[in-house]
Amino acid sequence: MKIIADSGSTKCTWLVTDGVHTSEYRTRGINAVQHSPEQIREALAELPPCGPVEAVYFYGAGCGGTFPEATEKMVRELRAHFGTGRIEAETDLLGAARALFGRGEGVACILGTGSNSCWCRGGEIVENVPPLGYVLGDEGSGAALGRNLVNGIFKGHIPLREEFLAAHGLTYEEIILRVYREPYANRFLAPFAPFVHAYLD
């Protein structure tokens, strides 16, 4: 059995294959930088039991050469869960690049709760500008669009305050508490992006 996972901060898609049959599962997202070992274990526990696992290829947010400690943490948790020796944990961007181009060449992009892009060649990333996460960057991502929307609405630059609050069943106070007192502000802000699309005019 081989497992391939594609994980952002919000959701993770798992493909489990024996070479003949493939099953797809979804769990909450795993960001190796943001999540503790306990949180990673909770996400892994959402998977159904698998047969003997030969290899796990995990492509996830917060993994890869930029974050060696977080990647090692992810590998440890995957090994503890699946009990296999063959574990690879790489950035979700590399997973997207390999899925798009295989060993070819081109520009691969991720646009979800976060955002990232790269130039890839031969199944490897050869050039990448760091996305910097939702506080410092992630331009164009759901979290950045949501952050900019909330900012514009409450500063009066976007005259849709009542429509926004009604559409999401929120108050100003609730928004501030969710962003500054609860974890995963990026996951809270990203679902506001469709509101931007609905009011493009």
Regions from the PLM with identified roles:
Residues I125-G169:
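Glycine-rich phosphate-binding loop plus the immediately following alpha-helix
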Residues H157-D201:
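A mobile "lid/hinge" subdomain adjacent to the ATP/sugar-phosphate binding pocket shared
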Residues D92, G112:
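Active-site glycine-centered loops adjacent to acidic/histidine catalytic or metal-binding residues
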Residues T10, A61-G64, T113-N116:
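Short glycine-rich anion-binding loops that position phosphate/pyrophosphate groups of nucleotides
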Residues C12-T17, R98, C109, S115-C120:
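Short beta-strand scaffold segments in enzyme catalytic cores
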Residues K2-E42, G51, I125-E127, P131-L132:
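Short glycine-rich, Thr/Ser-proximal phosphate-binding strand/loop in the N-terminal lobe
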Residues P49-A89, L100-G102, E182:
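Short beta-strand-loop/turn "lid" adjacent to the catalytic site in phosphate-handling enzymes
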Residues K2-D6, V53-Y57, E88, G106-I110:
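Short glycine-aspartate micro-motif
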